[in-house]
Amino acid sequence: MSGTPIENAIETLNAQIGQPSQPTDWFEITQERVNTFADATLDQQWIHVDPERAKEGPFGAPIAHGQLTLSIMSFLPGGAGVGLPSLDGMKLGINYGWNKVRFMNPVQVGAKIRTVGKLLSVEEKAGMLEVINEMTIEIEGVDKPACVAQSVLRIVF
């Protein structure tokens, strides 16, 4: 490759479109993390923060906030860049947003989750690259995923 860093990155990434990434490591959702998130967001609903009452609720246990699951998706090892290679000249990646977010299955406290990504598109925008990656949060031992969303990442060169 002999183009600019952005041109080289586009070529590299276009070769990976549609290919699933390796899953991240499993990450346990603890009651402490759920409580901390509840404190930060002021969402103190009992299905999240009251383990005794939550046992009697519709999920049989306390569950993580959907927004907590989505937030963690970006920061699991590899996060929003799951499957993206090292790109020459890349200075940083910026979380630009999310498309088509769906919370399909609640994550119970104590469950382990991981992310799998699949690169959907790469486009140059405003002197940066915009990368759209389909992200799936899987729950260990459960067939139905917790969340599927498209992360929109801007890469600065």
Question: What name fits each language-model region?
Answer:
Residues M1-Q16, F103-F157:
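HotDog/MaoC-like acyl-thioester-processing domains
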Residues S2-I94:
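Hot-dog-fold acyl-thioester-processing enzymes
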Residues F59-G60, D88, G93-N95, G127, ...:
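Short, intrinsically disordered/low-complexity patches at protein termini
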Residues G81, S86-L87, Y96-V101, Q108, ...:
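Catalytic-pocket segment enriched in acidic/His residues
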